[in-house]
Amino acid sequence: MGKLIFQKMAVEDYQSDHDLEEPSVYVGTYGKYNGEWGIWGKWISLVKCGDYDTFMEVCHTLHADEEDPELMFQDYENFPERFYSESCMDEDTFDKIMECYDMDDKEAFEAYMDATGDDDVDSFRENYMGEWNSEKDFAEHVIGECYDLDRMMGHLASYFDYGRFARDLFSEDYHYTDGYVFRR
């Protein structure tokens, strides 16, 4: 009967290909950094790792020359800064980075996090209203979706102050950040 042999991939198979713009971290250790090596490690692609356990296994394999490596994530690329920490990456953070990577509207999500402090993707999706050139453009959209001013007001509709309506909307109900609109 044949024997099944599990062959692990080499650390090099998980290295970042910077051209693909995948989320990656430069993985070193505090021991090497504070010792003779200085900054020594490799860029590891979180996408190629696929999950947190594989990522941690790759990191520890990379630094298998140390008895108990204290991992140091010395740099990062292609994911929001708020998810970066030099000293640790937990499974929840790894999963958030991967969820963000899979999004079509990453820039809007980053603007949402900056505006609200909330990094929950479901909250973002619930509160994201789209991309607009200005607060006034969004206000015009809201009025157009909800009311027929021409029918309601006739020729007086041209006197409606969309700018003032926009100020009211964005003073309490909405955020406008980098061209993106979010409910509060």
Q: What annotation goes with each model-predicted range?
A:
Residues G2-Y14, E21, Y33, A139-R184:
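Acidic, proline/glycine-rich low-complexity IDRs
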Residues G50-D119:
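Structured domain cores in non-transmembrane regions
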Residues E67-P69, K106, V121, L149-S158:
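Short, surface-exposed acidic
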Residues K106-Y147, F182-R184:
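Extracytoplasmic/secretory-pathway segments with low complexity and glycosylation-like composition
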Residues G2-H63:
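N-terminal ordered "arm"
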Residues Q15, V27, E77, S85, ...:
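Compositionally biased, intrinsically disordered low-complexity regions enriched in proline and serine
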Residues E22-G28, G38-S45, E70-Q74, D173-R184:
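Ordered hydrophobic segments in well-structured contexts
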Residues L46-Y52, M129-N133, Y159:
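Conserved aromatic
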